Amino acid sequence: MKFNGEKTKLEIGDYNKIRESVTINPGTKGGGGLTKVGNNCLFMVSSHIAHDCLVEDNVILANNVPLGGHAHIEKNVIIGGNSAVQQFTRVGKFAMIGGMCGVVRDIIPYAMVHGNRSILQGLN
């Protein structure tokens, strides 16, 4: 277990839309103690932001998208429904990830990816 009662933080910016059954975990001592969400994000039904994640501004997580711990989602990223982002993964700005995609490695900025192992399809 990562959390052991330490003082940790969860910062959520302005004008975010957080829908039903969304979960956002605070940071952990071993990960810097902070989970941070930027401004103007949309988290659709049952999406999940794990401990120590950094989600920048204008990010959209469609239904049932879990972010693993320590993930970094840069600004203006769209992640399609039922996709999953593995822990310690970075998704570059303006990237688009198709539905049902397994993101197991970093995604470059402006990329369009889809498939079980997030295959680069082109630039956004």
Give the residues covered by each predicted segment.
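SDR active-site lid
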Residues: A111-V113, R117-N124
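Structural signal for interior beta-strand "rungs" in well-ordered beta-sheet cores
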Residues: M1-H114
